[in-house]
């Protein structure tokens, strides 16, 4: 059992969020759903996204997300970055440096693992070039990061 589980208050759209998030991630499933009555709207849902559980609770319009909390997705390939970025961005807002806000207001970072490796390089010139390149991006481009890392 997961010890710490993100609990998201969704503005009256928990069922939509449940279906959306389980369609975005390839390894996703609906674990549990509680409804208000037998055929009523979803009250809460537990979903599993790539092995991590999230609880979604239907809440009124007072609940808002901020960038102070985001979910970091570690991607291995550009295809994975592109796929997750495009799906999560649908109806949302692109932000800088691999961040986006989805249509529910939840903030995500769609980041290739190569970025971390490049930024931890012992050669400060390489890591600074990569940081400079990344700061100009919205969606992260691994080839452009690699180009900056190589100094080409």
Label every PLM stretch briefly.
Residues 2, 51-52:
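Short, well-ordered coil/turn segments that N-cap beta-strands
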Residues 5, 44, 96-97:
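Conserved beta-strand and immediately adjacent loop positions that scaffold enzyme active sites
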Residues 38-41, 65, 104:
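Short acidic/glycine-enriched loop/turn segments that link adjacent beta-strands
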């Amino acid at each position: 059992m997961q010890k710490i589980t993100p609990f998201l208050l969704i503005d009256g759209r928990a069922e939509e969020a449940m279906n959306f998030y389980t369609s975005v991630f390839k390894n996703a499933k609906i674990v549990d759903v509680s409804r208000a009555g037998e055929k009523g709207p979803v009250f809460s849902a537990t979903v599993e996204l790539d092995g991590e559980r999230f609880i979604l609770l239907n809440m009124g319009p007072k609940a808002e997300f901020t960038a102070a909390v985001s979910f970091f997705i570690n991607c291995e390939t550009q295809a994975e970055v592109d796929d997750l970025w495009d799906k999560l961005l649908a109806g949302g807002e692109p932000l800088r440096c691999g961040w986006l806000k989805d249509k529910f207001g939840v903030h995500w970072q769609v980041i290739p693992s190569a970025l971390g490796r490049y930024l931890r390089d012992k050669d400060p010139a390489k890591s600074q070039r990569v940081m400079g390149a990344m700061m100009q991006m919205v969606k992260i481009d691994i080839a452009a990061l690699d180009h900056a890392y190589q100094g080409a």
